[in-house]
């Protein structure tokens, strides 16, 4: 969750639930549950206005602006944008070595947990392989800390892409899909040493697995997940 508080009261909050992880813990087939929700119109994990939060940058063949990932972080905001635009949007996966520690620890949605920059690279490539035209934008960015002691960073992001590749979400459906999530970093000595990323994995599957004849209306769903 991302929360903004004033005078000891939270007045702005964004939450991502790991509903997919919960379904797997219950011993249910995640893909079958997602397909059932999509085809039966069961109230699911979308906010009623979720499409209004779609990424600001549309799918395009044009490459995003190039930012160099600095060796020494002097401007945290520029560092965050450089990491996302260089690695996710420009597909420069070798740049992970400039941003992450070799033994980075990762925890993510649906029980993902691993250690090491190579495993992180494999995860990112697996996502981009499913959505080759994926376009990601940063919606909110918060941090605390300094260059000497390190930083704690929270990033709310959104992405849009077309499911054109084989991979963890099955055979290509050629459907446009919205992704959103919250990522938190711990940074020490100018490198990301820990990452926590929660994203809407059940919602991704719901968007992809609905039968073509389904009358499922995503705009009317009134729960988050």
For each of these PLM feature ranges, what is it?
Residues 1-225:
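C-terminal and inter-domain tail/linker signature
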